[in-house]
A protein has these predicted regions:
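Structural motif
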Residues: 94-98, 137-139, 180-182, 199-203, ...
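Asp-box/WD-like beta-propeller blade repeats and closely related beta-sheet repeat scaffolds
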Residues: 137-139, 143-207, 211-228, 245-247, ...
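Predominantly five- to eight-bladed beta-propeller fold
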Residues: 38-46, 50-51, 175-205, 238-286, ...
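Bacterial N-terminal signal peptides
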Residues: 7-19
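Short loop/turn segments that connect beta-strands within beta-propeller blades
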Residues: 101-104, 142-146, 209-212, 280-284, ...
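A short helix->beta-strand "capping" segment at the edge of beta-propeller domains
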Residues: 54-71
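Serine-hydrolase catalytic core recognition
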Residues: 303, 309, 441-444, 448-769
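Conserved beta-propeller blade repeats
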Residues: 70-88, 113-133, 155-179, 215-241, ...
Length: 769
């Protein structure tokens, strides 16, 4: 499960192994151009499906080796001359930095090869050098790969480096208190957080990346945090004073885990806010200002938080029911509330929507997303003051808005159309004022197109595309020439995968517990003999607030499961993937249907997909399995305890065993309270959301997989589950695999190989005999 709250508790074995990740030496594939039609809203344009290469022999059957080789691109960054794109390309938990020409003339080339972490990527002013941070150190590497990465500083390296908008300078800190290490909170989840290190005065400095000159800006006693540039690139803001957060470690042996296992409970203790300051980047006295209410909603940081030199945006949520937007003023005036959304249930828009307020680059407009009409839509309002204007309308979601460099257009992605699991890129163009905003869709056809990124010259959009026949890749679209087709820049699927053998999903609906239609994606193996009965599997997605897509999932952490389902399909399984109550893509009423009912109708929505499968003449109703990750694992545990004979076998991957236990974890308490209050307020809901309390009902085989370094759903949930199962004499029905050092979303190659092999064998053993 995934939340907007800052991580507060990490749980791991005290003796968890630190994995050694090996890099892959797989050759790059050449970039391919796929044809696509473009047009205004309503035209019958489509992205053509890739053609399978001619084969002289029988089609290749998917293997686990093939699944491991699928790569996943992320975090693309345009060069400042709009000619190249840098991005991360991950294979089995190992990611390196690549560069590809935006015209697709050459295949992507790696500029890092060691798989070491890369963060904060930005291009130098002349687009010949790429900068990034590694272990807090600012690094530089030649964009053409002619020179290996090296530190920018050779002596006394600075920390917390942040680049100016034009890429010519970096501001950084020297001395002062070192922040607490946050290792173990990221994707690899390795643990090992360290306490903050004491220090004296903190100096803010600015270094030129053009000539190497370096100047002191200001020095403050005590720690300095939140260093950033203002939108004009001429000033810096930062916070000083207050009480820095700290990390407290506890060794704990819960009573239900026996006497010989010691767990480390890592608690992130929040600090108190400090004073915000602004200072000229050339140096001088720093001026204190009121930074506004504590932020809590997913607004973007950086330049688009600044309206002009003096005014900035602050978003926050209040009691999980109100989302507010303020305009702050560095001159000392009190922040002004300019917009508020108030919910009866809870603010359910996810961070993935990127719906926070943004200022247009020219400072004229403020954009944000709101679901005030029941759907997540784009709104604009004048930065100088005035009422918001709704830009997109309809029964669809418009997400991830981003301003063009000239401030006249906003690109976004939406699932407008017949399939809620497809998304396309739209453009909102402002002609003079907000009474003249024209919206057009610039991609169409089957597939999921998300996360548009403008080129600095404003002529092209980079975005991610997936569809039923290909996993996520980066594509680029020229928005100045309607006749030009999108260009594919990466090809992340290994050549061994036969796309012609892949199964395309079909959107179906079936009645939920209250009769409301539940959407789901049905996968039927190609060439299936429908005159006989076959086993089937229900896949329950995680997060609660997520969804299935019309093809590969847009997120790597769920795309690997879509890949594995294609593997299961080629082994003869029918698969169904429901979008139960709480899922995104269907409006706020569906998303908020879990309010005060977690583990109630939402669980029934998912579990009743088995009834739909039983209506299919080619599915054996006695051989249906169920599995899920995280929130889906929680539903799986409910399925085997609330509906113990419906499913022949079940696989729980890092599922929540008890919501009262989940509530007690500071990392998850707020998320839980927003949906179901506290255990004291709603004991009935917490009782229904506690599958560990009913494991005496288990009568069918259960496989449990969990990583010890999981902070999203602490590993202790599975330990408590196993303890309860053993005490009820259910040990013969349970298989339990621990992955030392693994995070919530399985990433490392040896873990993926073991998990997929184990799940496949488990289903074969229990559903095919």
């Amino acid at each position: 499960m995934r939340h907007l709250l800052a991580p507060a508790v990490a749980v791991s074995f005290l003796l968890a192994l630190s994995p050694v990740l090996a890099t892959s030496a797989r050759d790059n594939k050449s970039a391919a151009t796929a044809t696509a039609s473009r047009g205004a809203r309503g035209t019958k344009a489509r992205v053509q499906a890739p053609k399978a290469a001619p084969r002289a022999q029988a089609a290749h059957r998917l293997t686990i080796d093939d699944l491991v080789e699928i790569r996943h691109p992320s975090n693309p960054v345009w060069s400042r001359d709009s000619r190249h794109v840098a991005f991360m390309w991950e294979r089995a938990g190992v990611a390196n930095l690549y560069v590809v020409p935006a015209d697709g003339s050459r295949r992507p080339a790696a500029v890092t090869t060691d798989g070491a972490p890369v963060a904060g990527v930005f291009w130098g002013a002349e687009s010949r050098v790429i900068y990034f941070t590694r272990a807090g150190v600012l690094m530089q590497v030649a964009a053409d790969g002619s020179q290996p990465p090296r530190p920018v500083w050779t002596q006394a390296p600075g920390r917390a480096a942040t680049a100016s908008r034009d890429g010519t300078r970096v501001a950084y800190l020297l001395g002062g208190a070192q922040p607490a290490s946050q290792e173990g909170r990221g994707g690899r989840g390795q643990g090992g957080a360290t306490p903050p290190q004491a220090g004296g005065p903190t100096e803010i400095r600015v270094r030129s990346l053009v000539d190497g000159s370096d100047r002191s800006v200001v020095t403050f006693d005590g720690p300095v945090t939140a260093l950033s540039w203002t939108g004009d690139g001429e000033h810096l803001t930062f916070t000083s004073g207050g009480t820095p957060g700290r990390i407290v470690r506890h060794d704990q042996t819960p009573a239900y885990s026996g006497a010989k296992i010691i767990y480390t409970i890592t608690e992130n203790v929040a600090g108190t806010p400090g004073q915000s300051y602004i200072v000229a980047a050339t140096g001088g006295a720093a001026t204190a200002y009121n930074a506004g209410p504590a932020a809590g909603f997913g607004g973007r940081g950086g330049a688009n938080r600044w309206i002009d030199r003096s005014h900035f945006l602050v978003d926050r949520t209040v009691d999980f029911k109100r989302r507010q937007i303020y305009v702050g003023d560095t001159s000392g005036a009190e922040p002004k509330l300019v917009h508020e959304d108030v919910k009866d249930k809870f603010w359910s828009m996810t961070g993935g929507a990127q719906g926070g307020s943004q200022a247009s680059p020219d400072g004229r407009w403020i954009s944000f997303l709101s679901d005030r009409d029941g759907w997540d839509h784009l709104y604009l309002m004048p930065a100088a003051g005035g009422n918001p204007v709704q830009v997109t309308r309809g029964r669809f979601e418009a997400w991830r808005p981003t301003w063009s460099p000239d401030g006249r257009r906003i690109a976004f992605d939406s699932n407008e159309g017949p399939s809620p699991g497809s998304r396309h890129i739209g453009l909102a163009t402002i002609s003079g004022d907000l009474t003249h905003v024209n919206v057009t869709m610039v991609t169409s056809g089957r597939g999921t197109n998300t996360a548009p990124v403008w080129s600095p010259d404003g002529k092209r959009l980079l975005y991610q595309h997936t569809d039923p026949l290909r996993s996520a890749d980066l594509w680029v679209l020229d928005v100045t020439t309607p006749s030009v087709t999108p260009l594919q820049l990466t090809d992340s699927m290994p050549p061994a995968i036969d796309r012609a053998a892949l199964v395309e999903p079909r959107l179906v609906h079936y009645p939920g517990p209250d009769g409301t239609p539940v959407p789901a994606y049905l996968f039927v193996p190609k060439g299936l003999d429908r005159s006989t009965k076959h086993p089937a599997i229900v896949w329950i997605h995680g997060d609660g607030v997520n969804q299935n897509y019309d093809g590969w999932h847009i997120e790597r952490n769920y795309a690997v499961y879509y890949s594995f389902h294609q593997y299961l399909l080629q082994r003869g399984y029918v698969v169904i993937a429901p979008d139960y109550r709480g899922s995104i893509g269907y409006g706020s009423a569906w998303r908020e249907g879990v309010y005060m009912d977690v583990g109630g109708k939402d669980f029934r929505d998912a579990a009743l997909s088995a009834n739909y499968l039983k209506t299919l003449p080619y599915v054996d109703s006695s051989r249906i399995g169920v599995w899920g990750l995280s929130y889906g694992g929680f539903f799986t545990l409910l399925a085997v305890t609330e509906m113990p004979t419906t499913f022949r076998a079940a696989v729980d991957v890092a599922g929540v065993a008890d919501y009262a236990m989940y509530y007690e974890d500071p990392y998850h308490g707020g998320w839980t309270v927003s949906r179901i209050g506290t255990p004291e307020e709603n004991p009935r809901v917490y009782a229904q959301a506690s599958p560990v309390s009913h494991v005496d009902r288990l009568v069918r085989p259960l496989l449990v997989l969990h990583g010890t370094a999981d902070v999203n759903v602490p590993y202790l949930h599975s330990v408590r589950l196993l303890d309860a199962l053993l005490k009820q004499g259910k040990g013969s029905l349970v298989q339990f695999m621990t992955y030392p050092g693994e995070f919530h979303y399985f990433t490392r190659e040896h873990v993926l190989r073991d998990a997929w092999t184990r799940v496949s064998a488990f289903f074969d053993e229990n559903l095919k005999k």
